[in-house]
């Protein structure tokens, strides 16, 4: 049995009721436990949730991209999940390795080997933030990857960072995040390294 089966991307060409009916059938057959979504906008999640109710299904977990330098999920995705009781498993907490400091050390990775990833992080502010994170990690005598993973888990929606690595040496700093205590002051200091996304509405100053 599969614990969580994800719809990896919203498909405008396929009716959601057909897809979710299939998920319901798979659950009835004992093949899956929970339904998850990945790379869905907030409105797409709520549309899926409304249709899923027809089949006695719920959206259990959402998998958005989320890191110190990719924070769009803070606008609607993370608040929605907190409101609706949907778990969050954020992927790419290291920004495809940019926040690990490995590119500063001259190591290779997705950003240097894949044009799609290079384009995704082709933003000077992201690279400035990554450099500042590295300097702060040195100041605190820790690894930048540790700080990045802890930061990505500290949002009030309690995201669970999805970590990955090509070697044990790369993996350990991320695992060390489990034991690193980050207070509010450090969390805010890290958050200030990269401008947050604009709010979902244009009159938020009136609230």
What kind of feature is each model-predicted range?
Residues 10-197:
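Beta/alpha (TIM)-barrel catalytic core signal, keyed to glycine-rich beta->alpha loops juxtaposed to Asp/Glu
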Residues 4-5:
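Acidic/hydrophobic-patterned starts of short beta strands in beta-sheet-rich repeat architectures
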Residues 201-206:
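Short coil/turn segments at secondary-structure boundaries
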């Amino acid at each position: 049995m599969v614990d969580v089966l994800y719809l990896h991307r919203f498909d405008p060409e396929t009716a959601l009721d057909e897809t979710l009916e299939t998920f319901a059938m798979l659950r009835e057959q004992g093949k899956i436990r929970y339904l998850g979504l990945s790379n869905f906008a907030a409105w797409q999640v709520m549309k899926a949730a409304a249709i899923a109710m027809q089949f006695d299904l719920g959206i259990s977990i959402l998998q958005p991209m989320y890191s110190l330098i990719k924070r769009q999920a803070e606008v609607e995705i993370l608040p929605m999940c907190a409101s609706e009781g949907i778990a969050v498993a954020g992927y790419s907490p290291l920004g495809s390795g940019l926040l690990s400091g490995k590119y500063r050390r001259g190591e290779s990775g997705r950003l240097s080997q894949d044009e799609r990833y290079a384009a995704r992080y082709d933003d000077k502010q992201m690279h400035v933030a990554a450099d500042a994170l590295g300097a702060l990690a040195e100041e605190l005598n820790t690894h930048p990857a540790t700080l990045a993973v802890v930061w990505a888990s500290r949002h009030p929606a309690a995201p669970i960072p999805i970590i990955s690595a090509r070697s044990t040496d790369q993996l350990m700093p991320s695992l060390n995040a489990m034991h690193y205590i980050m207070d509010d002051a450090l969390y805010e200091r890290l958050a200030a390294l990269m401008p947050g996304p604009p709010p979902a509405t244009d009159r938020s100053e009136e609230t």
